[in-house]
């Protein structure tokens, strides 16, 4: 079976597209014929070796996939079932989706919800699923469309594109943040009410800035998140799910104790299955298939390795889906 394989010898990492035998797959109670995988920021870090994402070598990357069950000893799945996998350390500690077959734990799988097909579910992928977890976090904390604008950082990326689309479809006014002025038309096409230059959120952080937004979804961390927090309206809510700008957070407690705001952490990797099912049900019902197509690029399997560095220099738009099985 064809696979992307990351290997390490001493301190040198190498990545190749190679052929593997099925008996090399790790343990698991479900064997899946992978139809589609995707390329995410974490996959790019793994493939390029720019961060210690991979915990075991050799490793097949790919933090998500969609496909059809080939064999199963798990009570919830049988051959022929169509399934989705996101997270659970797949592509980091357990071989992932950038291979024609994957053997995983059935507890990690989610049944494909109607009316999505396998390609659409992959187009949504971990980025879209994470975006929905963020939207659900805002809703859970009482943020409604009438409260004011919702700011979304990294809006032209995978999480940001889906978040912008989902929020706009529900009637929220979205302020889309991007470092690429050329993406303004794309973002407005997804439903953004306004487009903000990222530089507005990368400057010096004040304990309290001007009250601008009722809520936010942040993929960046660092000064971007800190500035976002300082500019929330009274009882605003920010859902944080990424660290593209850095793991630090140079903020103060002022927005929390003077404006009563909430910072909601969103983890898509170890998220409980009940929350996953809820997120995927909403994605199946709320996300416009036409908008999903608009934000997605299909990439040949053979180009995965050479494309990964583009994530790290910020030139990737939206989602990248990879047909795995020829």
UniProtKB/Swiss-Prot annotation:
So what EC number does this one have? Answer: 1.3.1.84
| GO-annotated molecular function | acryloyl-CoA reductase (NADPH) activity
Q: Which UniProt keywords apply?
A: Cytoplasm, NADP, Oxidoreductase
Q: Where in the cell is it found?
A: Cytoplasm
Gene3D superfamilies associated with the record: Medium-chain alcohol dehydrogenases, catalytic domain, NAD(P)-binding Rossmann-like Domain
- Under the cellular component aspect of Gene Ontology, which terms does the record hold? cytoplasm
Record Pfam families: ADH_N (PF08240), ADH_zinc_N (PF00107)
Asked if the Swiss-Prot or TrEMBL record annotates the protein with the keyword Thylakoid, the reply is no
Q: What induces it?
A: Moderately induced by acrylate and dimethylsulfoniopropionate (DMSP), as well as by 3-hydroxypropanoate. Part of the acuR-acuI-dddL operon.
Q: Which SUPFAM superfamilies match?
A: GroES-like (SSF50129), NAD(P)-binding Rossmann-fold domains (SSF51735)
Give residues annotated as binding NADP(+). Answer: 41, 156-159, 178-180, 198, 243, 257, 268
Q: What class of enzyme is it?
A: oxidoreductase
Q: When this gene is knocked out, what is seen?
A: Increased sensitivity to acrylate on plates, decreased ability to degrade acrylate. No effect during photoheterotropic (anaerobic/light) growth on succinate, no growth on 3-hydroxypropionate under the same conditions. Loss of 3-hydroxypropanoate and acrylate-dependent oxidation of NADPH.
Reactions catalysed: propanoyl-CoA + NADP(+) = acryloyl-CoA + NADPH + H(+)
Task: Describe its partners and assembly state.
Answer: Homodimer.
Briefly, what is this protein's role? Catalyzes the NADPH-dependent reduction of acrylyl-CoA to propanoyl-CoA. Is essential for growth with 3-hydroxypropanoate as a sole carbon source. Restores acrylate resistance when expressed in the E.coli strain K12 acuI deletion.
List other remarks.
The zinc-binding residues of the alcohol dehydrogenase family are not conserved.
Query: Which NCBIfam families does this chain map to?
Result: oxido_YhdH
Similarity-based family? Belongs to the zinc-containing alcohol dehydrogenase family. Acrylyl-CoA reductase subfamily.
**What's the protein here called?**
Acrylyl-CoA reductase AcuI
Which organism's genome codes for this protein?
A: Cereibacter sphaeroides (strain ATCC 17023 / DSM 158 / JCM 6121 / CCUG 31486 / LMG 2827 / NBRC 12203 / NCIMB 8253 / ATH 2.4.1.) (Rhodobacter sphaeroides)
Encoding gene, per UniProt annotation: acuI
């Amino acid at each position: 079976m064809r696979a992307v394989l990351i290997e390490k010898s001493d301190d040198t990492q190498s990545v190749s597209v190679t052929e593997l035998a099925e008996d090399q797959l790790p343990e698991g109670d479900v064997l899946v014929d992978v139809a589609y995988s995707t390329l995410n920021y974490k996959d790019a870090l793994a493939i390029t070796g720019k961060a210690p994402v991979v915990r075991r070598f050799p490793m097949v990357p790919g933090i998500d996939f969609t496909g059809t069950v080939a064999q199963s000893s798990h009570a919830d799945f049988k051959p022929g079932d169509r399934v989705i996998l996101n997270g659970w350390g797949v592509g980091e500690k357990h071989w992932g989706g950038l291979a024609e077959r994957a053997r995983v734990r059935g507890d990690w799988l989610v049944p494909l919800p109607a009316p999505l097909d396998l390609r659409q579910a992959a187009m949504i992928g971990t980025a879209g699923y994470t975006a929905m977890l963020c939207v659900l976090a805002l809703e859970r904390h009482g943020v409604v469309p009438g409260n004011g604008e919702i700011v979304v950082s990294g809006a032209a990326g995978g999480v940001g594109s889906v978040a912008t689309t989902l929020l706009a479809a529900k009637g929220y006014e979205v302020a889309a943040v991007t470092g690429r002025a050329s993406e303004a038309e794309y973002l407005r096409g997804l439903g953004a009410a306004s487009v903000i230059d990222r530089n507005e959120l990368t400057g010096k952080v004040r304990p309290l800035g001007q009250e601008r937004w009722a809520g936010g979804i942040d993929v960046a961390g660092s000064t971007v998140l800190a500035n976002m927090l300082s500019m929330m309206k009274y009882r605003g809510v920010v859902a944080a799910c990424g660290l593209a700008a850095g793991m630090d957070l140079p903020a103060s407690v002022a927005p929390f104790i003077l404006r009563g705001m909430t910072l909601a952490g969103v983890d898509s990797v170890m998220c409980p299955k009940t929350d996953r099912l809820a997120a995927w049900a909403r994605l199946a019902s709320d996300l416009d298939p036409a908008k999903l197509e608009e934000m997605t690029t299909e990439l040949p399997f053979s180009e995965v390795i050479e494309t990964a560095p583009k994530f790290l220099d910020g030139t990737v738009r939206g989602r990248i889906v990879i047909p795995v099985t020829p």
